[in-house]
Swiss-Prot record:
InterPro entries in the record: YjcZ-like
Pfam families: YjcZ_2 (PF09680)
Keywords: Membrane, Transmembrane, Transmembrane helix
Compartments, record wording: Membrane
Cystine pairings recorded for this chain: none
Protein name: SPbeta prophage-derived membrane protein YosA
Coiled coil start-end: none
Organism: Bacillus subtilis (strain 168)
Membrane topology: Single-pass membrane protein
Gene that encodes it: yosA
Amino acid sequence: MGFYSGYSGGYSGGGYGSSFVLIVVLFILLIIVGATFLY
């Protein structure tokens, strides 16, 4: 819920593009690092 409210707030604020891309990149990096430690 916190992510969704921040997502819609960024969208209406006009800063949707950069913040969303930043979140996606951080999420992908987190998955890669996690997979590296698991395997």
